[in-house]
Amino acid sequence: MTKRRVVVGMSGGVDSSVTAWLLKEQGYDVVGLFMKNWEDDDDGEYCSTRQDWIDVVSVADLIGIDVEAVNFAAEYKDRVFAEFLREYSAGRTPNPDVLCNAEIKFKAFLDHAMSLGAQTIATGHYARVRERDGRFELLKAFDHTKDQSYFLHRLNQAQLSKTMFPLGEIPKTRVREIAAQIGLPNAKKKDSTGICFIGERPFRDFLNRYLPTKPGPMKTPDGKTVGEHIGLAFYTFGQRKGIGLGGSKDGSGEPWFVAVKDIASNTLYVVQGHDHPWLRSRELVAGNVSWVAGEPPADGARCGAKTRYRQADAPCAFGRAAQAGDERFSLVFDEPQWAVTPGQSAVLYDGDVCLGGGIIESAATGRAGTAPAGRAPALVEAR
C-alpha cells in the first residue's frame, strides 16, 4: 500500500521539526522542504538562514526523512516585500506575515509540494482544519495562547483542503517535551520573533535602507510642537518606544504615544496617556477582504474580531458595504478598541472558527472637535 505523501515546511525551528516527526510516526511518507524567502546580505549578524538549514538537515537525518531546499526569494520580493514597502510609504503599518502565508507558504510552497507528488502539505502553525458539510473550516489552536489563525485568515478553501496543522491539538509545552524526548538537535532553540525577513535586526535601521527619511514636526492635539520626527513611515499608531520625547516638562508626565500621521502636512501627532481618546476606536472599515470560510458573515451578524495578533476577540457587529460591488466591511465594537491600525488585519471569528477578514483602511477615534484649526484631513492612522 502506497503511503500518503506529505511535504512539511521546515524552518529549522522546534515546531516544524516536531510536526515532521509526528507525521512520520503516523505512517505518512514525509518530505521536508526548507524555504529560503530572503537573500542573505551583509547582515550576517542577523540572518540565520545558514544555521536554520543546518538544523533542518540534522533533524531530517535524525527522524529519517528526505529534505530539500527551495529558493522563493524572487517570489517573496515581488509578492510580499514590494507591498510591504508600498504600505509603509503610504503611512500604513502592514503585516507581511499574513501576506507571506497566503502568497508564499500556501501558494508557491503548495505548488512546489504538489510537483513533488504530495497529496497534502503541513506546517508547524498552531491552528486546526476541520471539514464540515463539504467545506473546510480554519479553527483556532487548542492552545489559545499560541493560536496563529490570525496569520492564516487569507487562505482559501483550495489551500485549506490540502493543509494539515498537526500541532493544532497540542499545547506548546508538550511540543517542547516531545522535542527533548526524541532528542531533536534543536530542542532548545528559541522561537523566532519579529518579521520573517527582518529577523532580529533593528527595524528602523532595516526600513531606512529602502525608504528615505523625511523629517517633520511632532505636535500635540492642541497644535503645540514638541519635537521632530524622522519620517512618518518610521512610526506606527499606538507606538510608545522610540518617539524620543520622554516625559514632557509641562505635560502630565504620562508616556507619549503616536496618535495620527498627517500625510498632507507631514506632521506626527502624539498624545499622552495610554487611555487618551485619540487612541481608541469604536468603528473600523476594512477592505482587500478574504473569507477563508468561503463567504462573508450576514449583514448585522454578531462576531468576535481581532485587530492585532494575540488580542482577545472583541465582540462587534459586522456590516457590509451599502454600495453594490463594494466588498469592504465595517465593524462596530461593543467597547472602544485600542490602537486600531490601518494596514493591519481585522480578523473575524465565530467562536473558534475563523471566518476571514480584511485590511483595516480607517478607524473612527474620539477626535471629533479636538483637531487643531487648519489641520489637513488626509489622516492615515485612525482617520
UniProtKB/Swiss-Prot annotation:
Keywords: ATP-binding, Cytoplasm, Disulfide bond, Nucleotide-binding, RNA-binding, Transferase, tRNA processing, tRNA-binding. It catalyses: S-sulfanyl-L-cysteinyl-[protein] + uridine(34) in tRNA + AH2 + ATP = 2-thiouridine(34) in tRNA + L-cysteinyl-[protein] + A + AMP + diphosphate + H(+). Catalyzes the 2-thiolation of uridine at the wobble position (U34) of tRNA, leading to the formation of s(2)U34. Its EC number is 2.8.1.13. InterPro entries: MnmA-like, MnmA-like_C, MnmA-like_central, MnmA-like_central_sf, Rossmann-like_a/b/a_fold. It holds the Pfam family tRNA_Me_trans_M. The active site is at residues 100, 196. GO terms for biological process: tRNA wobble position uridine thiolation. Transmembrane segments: none annotated. This is tRNA-specific 2-thiouridylase MnmA. The gene is mnmA. One of its GO terms (molecular function) is ATP binding. Residues 146-148, 308-309 are annotated as: Interaction with tRNA. Residues 95-97 are annotated as: Interaction with target base in tRNA. It comes from Burkholderia mallei (strain ATCC 23344). Disulfide bonds join 100-196. ATP binds at residues 9-16, 35, 124. PANTHER family: MITOCHONDRIAL TRNA-SPECIFIC 2-THIOURIDYLASE 1, TRNA 5-METHYLAMINOMETHYL-2-THIOURIDYLATE -METHYLTRANSFERASE. The record marks 125, 344 as: Interaction with tRNA. GO terms for cellular component: cytoplasm. Belongs to the MnmA/TRMU family. It is found in: Cytoplasm.
